[in-house]
Amino acid sequence: INWKGIAAMKKLL
């Protein structure tokens, strides 16, 4: 998983 994936997940949360 890349940092973009984590950033997107944080936005969803």
UniProtKB/Swiss-Prot annotation:
Keyword Transferase recorded: no
Family membership noted in the UniProt record: Belongs to the MCD family. Mastoparan subfamily.
Protein name as catalogued: Mastoparan-like peptide 12b
Compartments in which it is found: Secreted
GO-annotated molecular function: toxin activity
Modified residues (Leucine amide): 13
Top-level taxon in the UniProt lineage: Eukaryota
Free-text function comment from the UniProt entry: Antimicrobial and mast cell degranulating peptide. Shows antimicrobial activity against the Gram-negative bacteria E.coli ATCC 25922 (MIC=15 ug/ml), the Gram-positive bacteria S.aureus ATCC 2592 (MIC=3.7 ug/ml) and the fungus C.albicans ATCC 2002 (MIC=7.5 ug/ml). Has little hemolytic activity. Its mast cell degranulation activity may be related to the activation of G-protein coupled receptors in mast cells as well as interaction with other proteins located in cell endosomal membranes in the mast cells.
GO CC annotation terms, alphabetical: extracellular region
Gene Ontology BP annotations: defense response to bacterium; defense response to fungus; innate immune response; killing of cells of another organism
Keyword terms of this UniProt record: Amidation, Antibiotic, Antimicrobial, Fungicide, G-protein coupled receptor impairing toxin, Immunity, Innate immunity, Mast cell degranulation, Secreted, Toxin
Expression by tissue: Expressed by the venom gland.
